[in-house]
């Protein structure tokens, strides 16, 4: 994630009441100070927070949530210091979503971000709370995120960057660079295909040249039958299959039925594809073999080298 993330859709509403109930059994301090609680109750709450965060972040390998939960009380010095550790993140959850209490974060000395929503931010940032008057109004806990390896990040639009990964986890589109072993029936050398989690394929590049016909095929075998052979009426001569029952992009346990295929339409989306295409040209040393067999006598074998780039795209 970036250094700051604001949760403004009530993501933590399900545990807000649990935190309020936990506060009722906390021994109240008579001085203006914070109270840190660690118990079996906070472990359960931490587990709930972890599950919520897993739904919010993509390409995360592991999320650790501290079972130490700090209830923040009014401090007359208006300054909060919980730890000297500046690695990881703080998560702030408001006990009551009143707009009067605010978190102020300072990315730079000249910049302030103010929020009255639940918020998560890097421990390296300076911060303070405003209008925390009388009683406990919010809780804080420490969060650690470990990300899956990312090949690179590519700008998708003016405000968003996407991680390009070699991992299937938490992704829903695979950009496949497919190089074909020489064969007298094949007219192409390299094609690039988008494969969604239902296995449907969209041809987007030939010889690294953008292809805009937007024809969606139910499988890679169907795409090959329609597009890569020199012979006319190939469908009347043979059909293709993968004897291992594999999909070209996804493990079988990752396949999902009913997915809509992402089709690039806007200039920004085609610019994104062009950037991905350029990266693929110079980062294709890792590949898998994929084999299709034609039911001729004797059988005809077509071998492909496939380099895979996984992306998570929000689309309908």
Swiss-Prot record:
Induction notes from the record: Expressed in the early phase of the viral replicative cycle.
Major subcellular location class: host cell
A Gene Ontology cellular component where this protein is annotated is: host cell nucleus
DNA damage listed as a keyword: no
Q: Which Pfam family is one of those matched by this entry?
A: Pox_C4_C10
The record's subcellular location field reads:
Host cytoplasm; Host nucleus
Query: What InterPro entries does the record tag this protein with?
Result: Poxvirus_C4/C10
Keywords, alphabetical: Early protein, Host cytoplasm, Host nucleus
Keyword Ribonucleoprotein in record = no
- Biological role stated in the UniProt entry: Plays a role in the inhibition of host NF-kappa-B activation. Mechanistically, blocks the subunit p65/RELA translocation into the host nucleus.
Family as reported in the entry's similarity comment: Belongs to the poxviridae OPG031 protein family.
What is the name attached to this protein's record?
Answer: Protein C4
Task: Report the source organism.
Answer: Vaccinia virus (strain Copenhagen) (VACV)
Gene from which the chain derives: OPG031
């Amino acid at each position: 994630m970036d250094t700051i993330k604001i949760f403004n859709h009530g993501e933590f509403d399900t545990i807000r009441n649990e935190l309020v109930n936990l506060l009722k059994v906390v021994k109240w301090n008579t001085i203006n100070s914070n109270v840190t609680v660690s118990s079996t109750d906070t472990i359960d709450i931490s587990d709930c927070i972890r599950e919520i965060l897993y739904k919010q972040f993509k390409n995360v390998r592991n999320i650790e949530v501290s079972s130490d939960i700090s209830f923040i009380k009014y401090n007359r010095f208006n300054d909060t210091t919980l730890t000297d550790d500046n690695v990881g993140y703080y998560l702030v959850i408001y006990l009551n979503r009143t707009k009067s209490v605010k978190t102020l974060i300072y990315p730079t000395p000249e910049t302030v971000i103010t929020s009255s929503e639940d918020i998560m931010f890097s421990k390296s940032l300076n911060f303070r709370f405003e209008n925390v008057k009388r009683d406990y109004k919010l809780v804080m806990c420490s969060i650690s995120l470990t990300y899956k390896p990312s090949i690179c990040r590519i700008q998708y639009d003016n405000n968003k960057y996407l991680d390009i990964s070699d991992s299937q986890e938490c992704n829903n589109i695979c950009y496949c660079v497919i190089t074909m072993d020489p064969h007298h029936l094949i007219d192409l050398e390299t094609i690039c295909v988008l494969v969604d989690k239902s296995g449907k394929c969209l041809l987007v590049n030939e010889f690294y040249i953008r292809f805009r016909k937007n024809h969606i095929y139910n499988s890679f075998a169907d795409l090959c039958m329609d597009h890569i052979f020199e012979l006319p009426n190939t469908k009347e001569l043979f059909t293709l299959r993968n004897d291992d029952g594999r999909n070209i992009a996804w493990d079988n346990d990752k396949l999902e039925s009913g997915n809509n295929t992402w089709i690039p339409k806007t200039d920004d989306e085609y610019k994104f594809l062009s950037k991905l295409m350029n990266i693929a040209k110079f980062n294709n040393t890792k590949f898998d073999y994929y084999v299709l067999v034609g039911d001729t006598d004797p059988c005809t074998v077509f071998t492909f080298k496939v380099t895979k780039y996984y992306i998570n795209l929000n689309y309908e």
